[in-house]
């Protein structure tokens, strides 16, 4: 069977053009109108809803969500205080806490905004010839005075980032993946990965992230990406 060289060249050009166009797609700037109008100074981080099978996910991510927010210029209510206050009010599960009316949260804590986090992935998975620990989360920042969503975003981090795979053949890769899974599961590798996810999700330094708060020297000085 003869191969039509002209057709092959056209197909190759089409594939190359598609790849180039795909690489040139730019992320649309987030609309911060409501955020700028609200000007929140304090943030209440609610216990994240955990959709992963790992029971450690909720408090692992919650305990590491305060730092990027504080570094971005906000007062963040201490995790222990928040957890204990909810327990004293008979609320012990993230789902119940997320269902509390915003005006009630405002009344109890006096916070300007609340952060609702949903954990989509947390933990180590063994996939054929690889093993990785992945944490993926979504978040919404809600104005407790009006109930409006001020900002929303998502982020993920993985222990396999930058992993070239290495040599050793198929057997070597299988052994490496199995050993890696055992180690990562035993030492809860999900916790440091959750820290990376939190930074990517909640830092004002990332594209389309939250705006800097009033405690930051960059408050109300965001560039064009924040408009």
Where on the chain are the PLM-derived regions?
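C-terminal/domain-edge helix-coil "capping" segments
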Residues: 24-41, 144-227
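Post-signal peptide N-terminal segment of mature Sec-exported envelope proteins
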Residues: 33-56
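Alpha-helix termination/capping residues and helix-transition junctions
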Residues: 18, 37, 108-111
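N-terminal segment of the mature soluble domain
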Residues: 52-116, 148, 152, 177, ...
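Solvent-exposed loop/turn segments at secondary-structure junctions
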Residues: 50-53, 82-86, 120-125, 156-160
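Surface-exposed short loop/turn segments
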Residues: 94-150, 160-172, 176, 215-227
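Bacterial N-terminal signal peptides that target proteins for export
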Residues: 2-13
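C-terminal motif of bacterial Sec signal peptides marking the signal peptidase cleavage site
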Residues: 19-23
């Amino acid at each position: 069977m003869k191969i039509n060289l002209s057709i092959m060249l056209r197909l190759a050009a089409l594939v190359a053009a598609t790849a180039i166009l795909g690489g040139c797609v730019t992320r649309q700037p987030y609309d911060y109108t409501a955020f700028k109008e609200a000007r929140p100074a304090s943030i209440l981080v609610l216990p994240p809803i955990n959709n992963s099978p790992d029971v450690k996910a909720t408090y692992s991510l919650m305990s590491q969500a305060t730092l990027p927010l504080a570094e971005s210029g906000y007062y963040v209510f201490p995790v222990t205080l928040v957890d204990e206050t909810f327990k004293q009010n008979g609320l012990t599960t993230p789902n119940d806490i997320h269902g509390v009316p915003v005006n009630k949260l405002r009344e109890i804590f006096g916070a300007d905004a609340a952060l609702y986090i949903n954990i989509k992935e947390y933990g180590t998975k063994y996939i054929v010839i690889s093993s990785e620990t992945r944490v993926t989360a979504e978040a919404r920042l809600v104005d407790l005075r009006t109930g409006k969503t001020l900002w929303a975003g998502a982020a993920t981090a993985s222990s396999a980032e930058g992993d070239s795979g290495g040599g050793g053949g198929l057997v070597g890769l299988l052994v490496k993946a199995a050993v890696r899974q055992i180690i990562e599961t035993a030492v809860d590798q999900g916790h440091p990965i959750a820290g990376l996810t939190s930074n990517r999700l909640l830092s004002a330094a990332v594209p389309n992230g939250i705006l800097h708060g009033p405690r930051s020297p960059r408050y109300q000085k965001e560039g064009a990406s924040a408009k």
